[in-house]
Amino acid sequence: MNVNSSSNRGEAILAALKTQFPGAVLDEERQTPEQVTITVKINLLPDVVQYLYYQHDGWLPVLFGNDERTLNGHYAVYYALSMEGAEKCWIVVKALVDADSREFPSVTPRVPAAVWGEREIRDMYGLIPVGLPDQRRLVLPDDWPEDMHPLRKDAMDYRLRPEPTTDSETYPFINEGNSDARVIPVGPLHITSDEPGHFRLFVDGEQIVDADYRLFYVHRGMEKLAETRMGYNEVTFLSDRVCGICGFAHSVAYTNSVENALGIEVPQRAHTIRSILLEVERLHSHLLNLGLSCHFVGFDTGFMQFFRVREKSMTMAELLIGSRKTYGLNLIGGVRRDILKEQRLQTLKLVREMRADVSELVEMLLATPNMEQRTQGIGILDRQIARDLRFDHPYADYGNIPKTLFTFTGGDVFSRVMVRVKETFDSLAMLEFALDNMPDTPLLTEGFSYKPHAFALGFVEAPRGEDVHWSMLGDNQKLFRWRCRAATYANWPVLRYMLRGNTVSDAPLIIGSLDPCYSCTDRVTLVDVRKRQSKTVPYKEIERYGIDRNRSPLK
């Protein structure tokens, strides 16, 4: 892609990097003025990522592998860093991995945020991150054959059903705290679950000393499906269905990645419509979580009232695109449908109604003593940079829509609740502004041509955090590689640190405060480190104990 060098961001960072590590950068390729990919010597990969991460305020939202043997004879690993300092940009660090040895130096000992991504690369490609501290599988089940790696480009017979390699679960859960702690397994299955997950809490009496968890029980293989069976625009509708709550955010991130790779200029009206639907999605997600927060502290009147108001956001979505879920609107280059005058006026009416309703509910919520008592000081996550991609890397129409960045310094469950409250009101204000200031342009850019093996990032600040997609185009009207990283993927690894030092009754509140995409898991096994005993109890008992704090299931 041709990029005007005068507007390129990150040049000073790259110059400093080349001075620090002479000869480390083998190649440099611009995707957009804000995005650049550098290929580095593989032995210097940890040094380069560590330098960008710690010395230039880097953030590591996603890393992934790619089977590029048909392109250059190698595998490749990519570490995408969002630079959060004075010069905000994206720097993707790439290293080529020998196809025979399949080894590359692990970055995790230098940057712990890389651990899940490197475990996934090992599972899906069979690459070996040398020095990776956590050697457990991440995605593949215990009975998966050692020599089968789903995302390789090798010919695979999808009718093949390999024999299980083991009849029992062999996954070792890790307790970094008191080795004698009681263990509480939570999950992995529940009849109402949308996605299973297995939690294990290590407790000493009522106190959680550590936690571990295993997910990916229902890995859907969406990335492989997109690469093998779907065209570019068909993947747009697949990305809608990555998540039941923030599907539109994923759809925007995917289309944005392809548009960035090809240099497609999306019409301004399409950008505005995308922003409107993203804020509608944020509304119904935040209202859902606020309702659940009420439930977890025993305030079920608030739970029902927040869900009542949430229905209006679903009605808003149906009014704008014909569906209560924000599906089917995006295309590469723009959107499929316009927002007409009557729809706009009815939506503005709903915005005014919702503002009054939410104001009343928040006043009632904050007047409930149990809310602050139960949520303040628990589930603390150390304060870091206040990040929001709508501000740090504006996309869609967020560079033009007035908005406010809300921060609370507690880092606890109460702070996360209050951020959602403030963002709910801000989303309503953003909707009013966008609906009143829609530009008069076309909806879709057409007539562009696809360029094989062009690639770029796309990103969205979803209600739970950032969704980051990376797309490399193929030469057969299909994607060569699609990496789809949901917000919760980055939220899970920090959960164990948020649970430590809190009580079992706090666990549902802490987990729920992340608003994770996971199931209502069924059972919890308690392992007492002192008595060296384990006990399995239904998760509903843990949830009930968190609400009324009577009749401890640990006794």
Curated annotation (Swiss-Prot):
Its EC number is 1.-.-.-. Belongs to the complex I 49 kDa subunit family. Keywords: 4Fe-4S, Iron, Iron-sulfur, Metal-binding, NAD, Oxidoreductase. Binds 1 [4Fe-4S] cluster. One of its GO terms (biological process) is glucose catabolic process. It comes from Escherichia coli (strain K12). Possible component of hydrogenase 4. Gene3D superfamilies: Cytochrome-c3 Hydrogenase, chain B (1.10.645.10), NADH:ubiquinone oxidoreductase, 30kDa subunit (3.30.460.80). Its cofactor is [4Fe-4S] cluster. GO terms for cellular component: formate dehydrogenase complex; membrane. It is an enzyme of class 1 (oxidoreductase). The keyword tRNA-binding does not apply. This is Hydrogenase-4 component G. One of its GO terms (molecular function) is 4 iron, 4 sulfur cluster binding. The keyword Iron applies.
